[in-house]
């Protein structure tokens, strides 16, 4: 692909290092050119493992947002998803934010409003809904196969 997307990662810890960066690297359509983490060593390690030769490293996400990037991945702790995403959208970046979208509906609405105001793409990593087991359960519920559900239990990774 001649014109690869230029992406930045904000938050180079667990989910970014374990899932996002390895997946992005295998796609071949996106170059990771910027890494930000409060722990500089994490960002430097991510650059060495997944970045382009000229990738940049930051501890302040606002400095990363000054770069000419097509998109940023927000992979930070849950409480920071909203304000980092809003800042990124206002900086003219498309955003893929890790789940959960925000810590409350008001923060989520700020994110939606910023995407609408800027005309930028905002996507949230709710990939679990496309898993075969999730799709099967959704289909069964919609078909009324489970009757009146009064209790459900699910397991998920939480921090």
Residue ranges and their predicted role:
Residues 23-27, 46-50, 87-91, 110-114, ...:
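Alpha-helical structural signal in soluble globular domains
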Residues 11, 99, 144:
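Conserved G/P- and acidic residue-centered "switch" motifs that form tight phosphate/ATP-binding loops
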Residues 34, 71, 151:
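Short, Asp-centered acidic motifs that coordinate Mg2+ and/or phosphate
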Residues 55-110, 114:
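Beta-loop-alpha module in the N-terminal Rossmann-like domain of NAD(P)-dependent dehydrogenases
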Residues 1-51:
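N-terminal Rossmann-like dinucleotide-binding module
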Residues 6, 31-32, 68-70, 93-94, ...:
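Structural signature of beta-strand start/N-cap positions in the alpha/beta core
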Residues 16, 59, 74, 97, ...:
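Hydrophobic residues in well-ordered beta-strands that form the structural core
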Residues 102-159:
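A contiguous active-site-proximal alpha/beta segment in oxidoreductase catalytic domains
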